[in-house]
């Protein structure tokens, strides 16, 4: 693996919780995923969180969250959360010429949205793996199949790997889920990331700021990044295979982190649930400080 470049970003996240009434919640919490160090991909240079009165929470993947308690929020008021980061992201290029060795025993199990034990997915993984001399070629076959056969369509939901094989279309969540599921079906460890994509003139028309992508564990290389969504066209196919471009910023690992309860980036609970209406809105802004290595 080589590291030919690095990019730095200033990232602003803001969430607002507006109590539209008719009463105030007895209990209200929101858990916000925090960008963290994730070697060798990224390093957090600084982080500022407001308001300060939050609790740090960790999950089974090592993801970190700020838990805020806004119980008793008065009707007609808005609570605002602001988080500012400076993050350095590495460009990584992997040499897959040597693909012999052992694999890991974890990140190979089926789970919600990663249906690697589904008969249709198992059969497809076996078919695509035929006559491939090693694990690296198998993963490339999965990657190429996804690019050639899935029809990209933003749907706003994660329908999982099995859903990606249907006629509804797929976006980054299904592209990633299918790559992970096909890999795990053949015993190849694979992980699912949710994060942010810095959009430039090349990616703005083909992706969204909120993004998902995988990495896979390959012999002699370790964890190797790829992006089947951005690599779905033939002209971009090689650019995003075994190449971590430094426009990807990891927020969480895992398709179903327990703290998020099926959500992405943040989750919000208040009760009694019928006591009032609390509207949560949020946005991200990403500024490139010194974008290089592309």
Question: Which role fits each region the language model picked out?
Answer:
Residues 1-92:
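Intrinsically disordered, low-complexity N-terminal segments that are enriched in acidic
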Residues 30, 142, 214:
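Terminal peptide-recognition signature
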Residues 60, 79-169:
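Acidic low-complexity segments
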Residues 143, 147-149, 159-194, 204:
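Structured core of small recognition/catalytic domains
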Residues 20-23, 73-78, 133, 184-187, ...:
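A short, structured loop/turn motif at beta-sheet edges
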Residues 177-265:
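Hydrophobic/aromatic-rich core segments of domains that either
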Residues 244-294:
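Low-complexity, Gly/Ser/Thr/Pro-rich intrinsically disordered linker/tail segments
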Residues 34-36, 85-87, 100, 194-196, ...:
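A mature extracytoplasmic/lumenal domain signature
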